[in-house]
Amino acid sequence: MADDGMLLNFEIGDAPLKSQVKFKGGRWRDRLKAQRSAKQSHEDGPSSTPPRNRTTVGGYDAGRLGKRPRTEDGESHRYAKVPRTSDAAPKAPSHAMKTGQISSSLFTSNPSAVTDFDQPPAEEEAEPAKASNAPLSEEAENFHSLGVSRRVAQHLATKLEMKAPTAIQKNTVPQLINGDSDAFLQAETGSGKTLAYLLPIVHRIMSLSLNEDGTPKDTKVHRNSGLFAIIMAPTRELCKQISVVLEKVLRCAPWLVCTTVIGGESKKSEKARIRKGVNILIATPGRLADHLDNTKVLNVGTVRWLVLDEGDRMMEMGFEDDIKTIVGKIRADKLEKVNAEGVVLDGVLPSRRVTVLCSATMKMNVQKLGEISLEDAIHIMAAKSESDGDADAVFAAPSQLKQSCIVTPAKLRLVTLIALLKSTFARRGSVMKAIIFISCADSVDFHYQLLKDTKAVEPPTPDSSSTKDRNPHTDTTVARAAYITSPANPKVMLHKLHGSLAQPVRSATLNAFSACKDPAVLITTDISSRGLDVPAVDLVIEYDPAFAVPDHVHRIGRTARAGRAGKAVLFLLPGCEEGYTTILNSSTPIAPQLYESILQKGLASVVNLPSTHTTSETDKQTWSTRAEALQLHLEQRLLANPAGADDDADDNPNPFRGNKGNHNNNTKPKSKQYKPKIDNPLLDAARQAFRSHIRAYATHVREERVYFDILQLHLGHLAKAFALREPPGGIGGGVARRTHTAANKAAAERKSKVSGGGGGGGRVGFGRGAADDDGDGVGAVDEDAARRMREKMRMVMNASSEFNIG
């Protein structure tokens, strides 16, 4: 067919072979992108219809938008308002912000636990476990048979309802009454170590004034007779508690006086009490060392006993140098055999200075403390049958304590905690008091603010009975709780306690928690883990695992004390943290629990939101939908505008652009439009709590970091545990970051003073006087908000940036 000479003619018309498409309107960048898109589509394949003129705004296609994620209110919003393609219409800036907030689901993308929850539980004993720290039988032992005077023994039985000693008291009291050697007391928490060393001291001091049959002697000892015993404890709370116990014992001997000298109190008042006279002094190491240096009336020549309670904790807190100084000064003073009034002390009191060291653990730092303070000491334990090979081991928890751990993903930690507390207080009288241990003070503050009721408390009338009971020191640390109440317990009191609070606030809060008749929850740090004996504590929750195993033992020792039953719950993350239970020395197995069972039990009924919030829940909702709704509610609380904030910004999205059609540059906008947006204080507290939690997570002891690997933390998931939708920045600043911030603040204050000292000529919303920042970070928030506002104004007003291709 190639040789037949056939020719074919095609009519293509007068139109050009390639269609020329012109794009009009919009910005030049948008037109350039449209041309490139048309060129690409022409190269991919010809089309019978020319490409449509699609104008993109803010980097998004205005003709057809892709699928958008669903937001918190269940509707799909556009990222930016799409203007008309007319040239006269105002164009949206290229830096248009997204207005939708994305909230991820709680039950997706969670790591799976490696613990086998299907393993059948261990067979429970037919009879409940016998309490290991309970008092002995009254028929077998009593305090009088241990050598305590009949007056003291009768006082303990009738006034304090203590008729029988515990095991550690049985082994310690006779030894300290009849002997003068140093002693190291080692026993589990809640076993009565405090009375074990207090009773011999009180008995032998009372013997200076009373005969064995209780008849008075010719010489009577009083508060000016001399200082006979010094008791040191690591924390102020423990000193206060020892003082309370000792005052109860000394009611049978009112001529003897005890007092406390602790940090945070007035040194002038402490000196006045010492000057009046004291027989037993209870102190923290730092304040005692200060008084030994500066208080001349403090005479330690008559001191016969030096007690170091919770010695391991004192070494961990860095009191080694203070203890060396105190022990050295006491030993350097000559031992007086006769006091200033001529009362002979030898023969009744020890002929040498006796040092008693108390600890529930036998660690290297305790052994070092023993080398500093003890000489030829005897080792006294609760059970003499224990082998010496276990001396280095951590003492186990009481046998009647039931322990469990909840393996919950990071996303679900917060709602699981609320569900656990809600189920705990579901029945009246089941649990009276619960303690939640958290790793850092910032996290304690955040969880307290989050869980408390937001309804403002009405001030009591002058005639009401609550006016007399009201303590101004607890206004910021005690409140009614929300979320965790139930019809059986409509009132649950919430308390917080940590070391950053002032001493009067700490003491008042602890007293309020101890004396509370309603169900109560204490959110605290490790400051409450040592020695505190709060009555009716039935539940201990370790929301954050302890930094070391000994701290874990002391934490759970706040419950199941003196033979009472108790429960302890440990929160762990899936993964490496699950192996942490293998190193916990426990007399009872730690039972793992599924977080689903906690949520099902706690969220079986409607959650009671704070009084200022309304709920749309119904009884037909499932526990999973309630968990998601609760998490969403908590996140919305953080994102809500703070009280008194300016909410008129929605009327004019751009405060620097006048009303539509108004081009008069002389028109001044309202001053409220220049106010920078201030974040919700609860949101700032959540961010700070998250940062502090991450830093605290990295401080576990070296031997346990294999179970707490910070590199395996999912920061985005962990942010949900603080009701945050994304992890905040500024985690790794440390001291350098704070120093740099402080330097910037100082420079800004100097600049403001030079420019006018914060007078009336400053711009609204941008100037910041020196009084705006009171040291709590609020001024930094305002300064950062003003900086962001200035940057946004420059981006809007600077026309040259539109043509900056780079």
From Swiss-Prot:
Question: Residue numbers of motif DEAD box?
Answer: 309-312
Composition bias of kind Basic and acidic residues appears in 69-78
Superkingdom assignment: Eukaryota
Signal peptide boundaries: none
* Catalytic reaction list: ATP + H2O = ADP + phosphate + H(+)
Instruction: Motif Q motif — list its residue ranges.
Output: 141-170
Location of region: Disordered: 24-135, 642-677, 741-784
Positions contributing to ATP binding:
187-194
Q: Which GO terms describe its molecular function?
A: ATP binding; ATP hydrolysis activity; RNA binding; RNA helicase activity
Localisation per UniProt entry = Nucleus, Nucleolus
Enumerate composition-biased segments (Gly residues): 755-768
- Record-annotated Helicase C-terminal domain positions: 413-611
Q: Give the EC number(s) under which this enzyme is classified.
A: 3.6.4.13
Entry-linked SUPFAM superfamilies: P-loop containing nucleoside triphosphate hydrolases
GO BP term, pick one: endonucleolytic cleavage in ITS1 upstream of 5.8S rRNA from tricistronic rRNA transcript (SSU-rRNA, 5.8S rRNA, LSU-rRNA)
Identify the SMART domains for this entry.
Answer: DEXDc, DUF4217, HELICc
UniProt domain comment: The Q motif is unique to and characteristic of the DEAD box family of RNA helicases and controls ATP binding and hydrolysis.
Q: Which family does it belong to?
A: Belongs to the DEAD box helicase family. DDX31/DBP7 subfamily.
Protein task: ATP-binding RNA helicase involved in the biogenesis of 60S ribosomal subunits and is required for the normal formation of 25S and 5.8S rRNAs.
Give the PANTHER family listed for this entry. RNA HELICASE
Q: What is this protein called?
A: ATP-dependent RNA helicase DBP7
Q: Which organism is it from?
A: Chaetomium globosum (strain ATCC 6205 / CBS 148.51 / DSM 1962 / NBRC 6347 / NRRL 1970)
